[in-house]
Regions:
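Cysteine-centered catalytic environments shared across enzyme families
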Residues: 5, 9
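Formylglycine-dependent sulfatase
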Residues: 2-4, 19-460, 468-500
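Hydrophobic h-region of N-terminal signal peptides that target proteins for export
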Residues: 10-19
Length: 500
C-alpha cells in the first residue's frame, strides 16, 4: 500500500510538472536604441550579431515591425500596458527620480501572465518611474515593478546616463551603506559635489550636450547625486551583472512557467562595454556595445540549453525605438560609422516621426514550435500583450490598443493590425498599408543629436514600399489617400494631438 501511495504521489507530481510545462516560458529581450540596420540578420555587414541572428534565422524575422514611439519611456509603457502612450500624459522621457507612470490598478502584461499561472520577473533597464515622487532611496522604493505585476525585479531606475547610478532589487538599492545615504536632485547640485562643468579634469568621457551634472566613474550624467558610493555600479560591469541575474532567475524557475522581461542597456549612452569587448568592431564604443548586447543574448540562450528548457521557451527580441549616434557624449559614433546605416536605410532615427524612429528589429523564436520565416506582416510591440494572452489562456480587458495577432507572431497567418498611430515627442503620424502620413509640425528639422525629427511645413505622404527612405512626398499625387489617412488619424486621436 505504501509503495502504491508513493507511486500515486509520483504520478501526481509528474502530472503537475507536465501541466506546468505545457505553457512555454516567455522571455522578452528589449534592446535600447538598437536600430533595424544594426543587426546582421537584416543585412548589416559592419557589425556581426550571431546570437541575435540565431533567433532571427530560427524563428519569425519581422521586416515590418514597429514600436509605438520613437523614445524609450512611451515605447515601454505601450509594451507593458497594450495602450497607446500618447493617451497617458506622463508617458514621456522620464528623469531618474520620476514617479511610476503605470497605475497600480492598471492592467499590465506581467499581471496577465501572473494570473495565467506564470512567475514574473523584470531585469535590466526600467525607465517607467518608481515611487510616488520625492523618493527616499534609502528605504524600499514603491510602487514599482513589483506593484504592477512582477514577482521579482532587479533594475536600473531610468537609463545608464541618469542618476541614481545604482541597482534596485525588489525596491531596495543593492549594496547600500545606510551610513552613506543616497540623495538625488534633478534641479540643483549638492554642496561640494563635483560636476562635469566645474570639474572637467575628473572626466574620462567628454560630454556633448545635456550630460554635464554629477560625475560617476569619470562619466558625466544627467541629474545630481550624492552618497551611495558603495552601491554605485561600474558601467563596464553592467552587462555581466544583469546576465548573472538572468541566469539565476532562469535556474530558480526552470521547473515552472515563467515570464521574464530583460531590458538590455545597450547601445544606449554612455557606451562603456566591458573591456573584453573593446575594439570588437571598427565603429568605436557603439559598435562594441552592440557586440556586448549580442553576447548577452548568447548567454541567455546557452543557459536555457544548460537548464534543458530552450525547447519550452519563447524568446522575443526587439528594441524600444530607433537608433541614434550622437546622444550626449563624444564617443566617435558619428566619426566611425562609415557606410553602416543603423536605421537600415530608413530616414530619421530615435526621436523622429520618420520611419527610422519606430521601425525596429523584432524576432520571435521558439525552438521546435515556430518554423523559420522571413515575414512582411505588419505588427506592433503592444500587440504582444493580447497575443500572448491568447497563447497562455490569459484574460484581457476590452479597449486595449494592442491587437491580438498571435498567428502572425507564430508565423502561421496574416496580421490583424491594419494601422498604427506612431508617436515621437508627443507628435503623431499615421501608418497603414504601404503608407505613412506625417502632419505638419512646427519645430527644428533636426535636434541636437543630428537626427531628423519629421517636423515638416506641409502634410507629407510616403509610400514605404516604393520609397523606404522617404525621399519623395507624394501627397499631391494621391490626395484621396491623404484625406483618408487624415480622417482616420483624427478619428483615432479625437483630433486632440494633431498639429501640436
Amino acid at each position: 500500500m505504501r509503495k502504491f501511495s508513493c507511486f500515486v504521489s509520483a504520478m501526481l507530481a509528474g502530472a503537475a510538472w507536465m501541466a506546468a510545462q505545457s505553457k512555454p516560458n516567455v522571455i522578452v529581450v528589449l534592446a535600447d536604441d538598437l536600430g533595424f540596420g544594426d543587426v546582421s540578420a537584416y543585412g548589416s555587414k559592419t557589425i556581426s550579431t550571431p546570437n541575435i541572428d540565431r533567433l532571427a534565422r530560427g524563428g519569425v524575422c519581422f521586416n515590418n515591425a514597429y514600436a509605438t514611439s520613437a523614445t524609450s519611456t512611451p515605447s515601454r509603457y505601450a509594451l507593458m500596458t497594450g495602450m497607446y502612450p500618447w493617451k497617458n500624459p506622463d508617458a514621456k522621457i522620464l528623469p531618474g527620480d520620476a514617479p511610476l507612470i503605470i497605475r497600480e490598478d492598471e492592467f499590465t502584461l506581467p499581471k496577465m501572465m501572473r494570473e495565467a499561472g506564470y512567475a514574473t520577473g523584470a531585469i535590466g533597464k526600467w525607465h517607467l518611474g518608481m515611487g510616488k515622487g520625492k523618493i527616499n532611496w534609502n528605504e524600499t522604493v514603491k510602487p514599482g515593478a513589483n506593484q504592477i505585476g512582477f514577482d521579482y525585479s532587479c533594475l536600473i531606475a531610468a537609463t545608464n546616463d541618469r542618476v541614481p547610478t545604482v541597482y534596485i532589487e525588489n525596491g531596495d538599492v543593492v549594496g547600500l551603506d545606510k551610513n552613506d545615504p543616497i540623495e538625488v536632485d534633478y534641479e540643483k547640485n549638492f554642496p561640494g559635489e563635483p560636476t562635469a562643468i566645474d570639474n572637467p579634469e575628473m572626466l574620462r568621457m567628454k560630454w556633448h550636450h545635456g550630460h554635464n551634472n554629477s560625475i560617476v566613474n569619470g562619466i558625466p550624467r544627467i541629474g545630481f547625486m550624492k552618497g551611495g558610493t558603495a552601491a554605485r555600479w561600474r558601467d563596464e560591469d553592467m552587462a555581466d551583472y544583469f546576465v548573472g541575474k538572468v541566469k539565476d532567475y532562469i535556474t530558480a524557475h526552470a521547473d515552472a512557467p515563467f515570464f521574464l522581461y530583460y531590458g538590455l542597456h545597450e547601445p544606449h549612452v554612455p557606451r562603456a562595454p566591458h573591456e573584453r569587448f573593446a575594439g570588437s568592431t571598427t565603429m568605436g564604443p557603439r559598435g562594441d556595445a552592440i557586440v556586448e548586447a549580442d553576447w548577452c543574448v548568447g548567454q541567455l540562450i546557452d543557459h536555457l540549453e544548460k537548464e534543458g528548457i530552450l525547447d519550452n521557451t519563447m524568446i522575443i527580441f526587439s528594441s524600444d525605438n530607433g537608433p541614434v549616434l550622437q546622444d550626449g557624449y563624444y564617443d566617435e559614433a558619428v566619426k566611425k560609422v562609415g557606410d553602416h546605416s543603423p536605421t537600415g536605410g530608413r530616414r530619421g532615427g530615435k526621436y523622429s516621426l520618420f520611419d527610422g524612429g519606430t521601425h525596429i528589429p523584432l524576432f520571435v523564436y521558439w525552438k521546435g514550435h515556430i518554423a523559420p520565416l522571413n515575414s512582411d506582416e505588419f505588427v506592433c510591440q503592444m500587440d504582444l500583450l493580447p497575443s500572448l494572452a491568447k497563447m497562455v489562456g490569459g484574460k484581457v480587458p476590452a479597449g486595449l490598443d494592442g491587437i491580438e495577432t498571435l498567428d502572425a507572431f507564430m508565423g502561421k497567418g496574416a496580421s490583424n493590425r491594419k494601422d498604427l498611430v506612431i508617436e515621437a515627442k508627443s507628435k503623431v503620424a499615421f501608418r497603414t498599408g504601404p503608407w505613412v502620413m506625417i502632419p505638419p509640425y512646427k519645430g527644428k528639422a533636426r535636434n541636437v543629436t543630428g537626427n531628423e525629427l519629421g517636423n515638416l511645413k506641409e502634410y507629407a505622404l510616403f509610400n514605404l514600399v516604393d520609397d523606404p527612405a522617404q525621399l519623395t512626398n507624394v501627397a499631391d499625387k494621391y490626395p484621396e489617400v491623404l484625406e483618408d489617412l487624415k480622417k482616420r488619424l483624427a478619428a483615432q486621436t479625437d483630433g486632440k494631438i494633431v498639429n501640436n
